[in-house]
Every structure is written in structure tokens, then in C-alpha cells.
Amino acid sequence: MTKISKRMKSLSAKVEDKSYAPLEAIQLVKENANAKFDETIEAHIRLGIDPKYTDQQIRTTVSLPKGTGQKVRIAVIAKGEKVAEANSAGADLAGEEELIDSISKGEMNFDLLISTPDMMPKVAKLGRVLGPRGLMPNPKAGTVTTDLISSIKEFKAGKLEFRADRAGIVHVRFGKASFSPEDLLENLKVLHEAIDRNKPSGAKGRYWKSLYITSTMGPSVEIDIAALQDSKEE
């Protein structure tokens, strides 16, 4: 049984068992983010989907207008002039066979992997290593592309890839505790729109089941989904 710390008990006591208006929830999460570092703010969204069916899966990207506040380390697998192009665009790592070899050995000092289409047959062989970590490049996520310059700049600026896990829950970071409540809310609205826009064709019944936000070291707070929808229309 997991022991709950006195700090977490104290913070959890501030959160009522109810769904909050979006801005109120964000302010409460920020108030509880009192660790000695700039905590990441995350959203955990339960959707009415069963990802074991291909027509109920969601995997896409979203460009957060206020960014994520987090430095993203990007690796690029390409060859020839594309390697130089990736480096000039700000990739942290770029290469061909040597990078593939280091990844196969478990050396993955990056948060995102981009590949050019011609390298995907070789990258596919790294599935056992990349797959469990959610790092396999995918065209739907914008990580298989010939336009390396645009892709790298977009992901560095705050573009995020997200997907639902096996339970149909999407986990996404959308800012830092140091962000203003208004900036966090703007990012959350854009995330909400992206999930709606990419609703799987096989989704049945109520699409949005629940939405909780939390900081790295704080308790979760439920957001009133209807209120979030209303705030988007204001």
C-alpha cells in the first residue's frame, strides 16, 4: 500500500470532490505546485474509446500557442544533405547508420525521434526499442517527413504528439506552473479542440468521459468539461 506524504495530504485537503470551472481548476493546481522546481502541468483525459479497435484510436499532434515551457531534445535519422539540414534546423542529434546503431544499443538521449521516409525501413527494425517508449516515428504524428526544417522548428516551439493509452486515456503536458492561468487555459482550449477534431470514427456514446489536471508533485483536480466547452465559445 502506497503511503501518502503529509505534504500530499495537506494539498489534497484543498481540493473538493467536485468538478471545477477551468480557470478555477488551473489556479488551484498552480497554488498546489509548491515544489522547489518549476512543475509541469499535465492533463489526463478519459475518452469514450476502446483503442484495441483500429477505428477507436487517436494519435495526433497539437501546437500549443503558449508552448510547453520544456526543452525538447530531438534526434533525426536521415542521410546525406538531410543530416546537415537537420543540424542547421536545431536538431540535438542527427545521423544515419551510426545513430541507428546507438539507438539499437539503448542509447536514447532524446525526447522525440524524426525520420525521413527513405530511412523508415531501417528505423522500423528498432521497433522493440522505440515502440515501448512511444518514440517510433509516425506520419500521423508528423515525425516521418522530408520537411525537416519545419518539423524541427514546430516541435521545438511547442508542438506535441499525443495518443490514448490502452485504457483510452490521453496524458498530455500543457505548460509549467510558472505560466499564467490565462496562458495555461489557452493551451488547454487548443488541446481540447485538437482532441475533438481528431475524434476516432468508431467512437460511440459520450466522447469526453472526464478531464483532470495536475502538477508534477500535486494532487489532481477535475475540470467541468461542459464549462471548458463554453469557455472556448466566449
Curated annotation (Swiss-Prot):
> What InterPro entries does the annotation carry?
Ribosom_uL1_bac-type, Ribosomal_uL1, Ribosomal_uL1-like, Ribosomal_uL1/biogenesis, Ribosomal_uL1_3-a/b-sand, Ribosomal_uL1_CS
Give the signal peptide range. none
- Whether Transmembrane helix counts among this entry's keywords is no
List the residue ranges forming a coiled coil, or say none. none
Instruction: List, alphabetically, the Gene3D superfamilies matched.
Output: 3.30.190.20, 3.40.50.790
Q: How does it assemble?
A: Part of the 50S ribosomal subunit.
Protein name, entry field: Large ribosomal subunit protein uL1
Originating species: Prochlorococcus marinus (strain SARG / CCMP1375 / SS120)
What lineage is on file? Answer: Bacteria, Bacillati, Cyanobacteriota, Cyanophyceae, Synechococcales
Q: Which gene encodes it?
A: rplA
